[in-house]
Amino acid sequence: MEEVINGILIREVETKNIMTKSSLPVGGYSVNPYVGCTHACKYCYASFMKRFTGHKEEWGTFLDVKHWPEIKNPKKYAGQRVVIGSVTDGYNPQEEQFGNTRKLLEQLIGSDADILICTKSDLVVRDIDLLKKLGRVTVSWSINTLDENFKNDMDSASSIEHRIAAMKQVYEAGIRTVCFVSPVFPGITDFEAIFERVKDQCDLFWLENLNLRGGFKKTIMDYIAGQYPDLVPLYDEIYNKHNRSYFEALEVKAEKMAKKYDCAFVDNEMPYGRVPQGHPVIVDYFYHEEIRGTENT
């Protein structure tokens, strides 16, 4: 089936297996209930997927809805990391209609897998009932600004306030949460201000630098030139001259922030478990793609 719904080209496609062995540093398996993502983030690395899927449409304007054989033996994934949403957002707006992510979670109940859900949506609160049944599950929201205008320039996902509210609701339901400050835009992202907003409702606070490569490098550089002209020299130093001093200074700032708030500070690690409220583990993912082979998610 193929149709256009609210300007998005929707196709329903068959896939032999929804579970894919992952090359991600945190993954045993990557699971993407959809192909494409209608958040249309300007900096999204996943737009490279078009090379493999054959889509000619602009990234963010299409979505393939996958149909897969039911997972008959979820115990097969016991102890494995399962990342939901590595190159899509399982809670894109179309999830309300198609329900693929909810169906996936239902099939993973009893798996004893270590599940990580990556999203920019507040729709995840719909599935709190299932998240509670899954045991080891973590929900991560990407939040790299408190400025809704900048957010709207970058993506069409849920508002920052809605993401923060969803994080609070999921956290209070007893589910481990992550605030993923990704990507950190030089001169724009104030990660300490974000930390102060979310520290009482997240267990982990990840920091990742903005990577610029491929087609979206020009998009972002042109945006900075048009909207933040004073930052052009900084972006030129970082992304054309490969000067790392800015992010090296941010690492120092993040470590000082950890001491200030009595939080653990770890380098390219993903600790497990819950932490005392108000003291999330701060995870330094700056330049981690060189160590572990990934980019902004």
Short names for language-model regions:
Residues 156, 168-189, 240-244:
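Conserved strand-turn element in the central/C-terminal portion of the radical SAM core barrel
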Residues 133-139, 199-204:
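Glycine-enriched alpha-helix->loop->beta-strand junction motifs that scaffold or abut catalytic
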Residues 1-138, 146-150, 160-161, 165, ...:
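Conserved Radical SAM active-site core
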Residues 87-89, 120-122, 142-146, 182-184, ...:
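Active-site beta-loop-alpha junctions enriched in small/polar residues
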Residues 29, 82, 115, 139-141, ...:
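Hydrophobic faces of well-ordered beta-strands that scaffold small-molecule active sites
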Residues 149-150, 187-190, 214-216:
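Short acidic/glycine-rich loop or secondary-structure boundary segments that cap or lie
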Residues 109, 171-172, 199, 259:
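Anion (oxyanion) recognition and catalysis
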Residues 2-14, 192-297:
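Auxiliary Fe-S-binding modules of radical SAM enzymes
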